[in-house]
Amino acid sequence: MVYQSRSFQVEVSGLHQNEVTNQNNYPIRSSGSVFITIPFSRFNEELQRINRLGGKIVNIQPLNLQINEN
């Protein structure tokens, strides 16, 4: 079994609680920044969505999961 998943944890600031962000499955912290885990396959779309909502990307960290069983 070989399983690889490429995901990224993105720290976003500048998002404010509103009708659109209320529909998200993560809360906006009082510091004004949120951490969002994004799979590589949706990375571009999610960054565009964050930009449309007025967010600013503060940090991006890769999260790699690899399982190799022979």
Swiss-Prot record:
It is found in: Cellular thylakoid membrane. Keywords: Antenna complex, Membrane, Photosynthesis, Phycobilisome, Thylakoid. Disulfide bonds: none annotated. The keyword Membrane applies. Residues 5-63 form the CpcD-like domain. It is a peripheral membrane protein. One of its GO terms (cellular component) is phycobilisome. One of its GO terms (biological process) is photosynthesis. InterPro entries: CpcD-like_dom (IPR008213). Its main location: membrane. It holds the Pfam family CpcD. Belongs to the phycobilisome linker protein family. Rod linker protein, associated with phycocyanin. Linker polypeptides determine the state of aggregation and the location of the disk-shaped phycobiliprotein units within the phycobilisome and modulate their spectroscopic properties in order to mediate a directed and optimal energy transfer. This is Phycobilisome 8.1 kDa linker polypeptide, phycocyanin-associated, rod. It comes from Microchaete diplosiphon (Fremyella diplosiphon). The gene is cpcD3.
